[in-house]
From Swiss-Prot:
Transmembrane segments: none annotated. It comes from Naja kaouthia. This is Cytotoxin 2. CDD domains: TFP_snake_toxin (cd00206). Expressed by the venom gland.
Length: 60
């Protein structure tokens, strides 16, 4: 699986076991992702942070 880094022109291949890509947004500003990368389990959203997870190459 390949996931985009913070700047979507760059991406990385995920290590074994991390088979989801994710984007993290601040709830107050949903237009600009704060973090992107590979993850094993999609984190729960909180009052401050929203996560979007997916499982295809460069989907984040």
């Amino acid at each position: 699986l390949k996931c985009n880094k913070l700047i979507p022109l760059a991406y990385k291949t995920c290590p074994a076991g991390k088979n989801l890509c994710y984007k993290m947004f601040m709830v107050s500003n949903k237009t600009v992702p704060v973090k992107r990368g590979c993850i094993d389990v999609c984190p729960k959203n909180s009052l401050l942070v929203k996560y979007v997870c997916c499982n295809t190459d460069r989907c984040n």
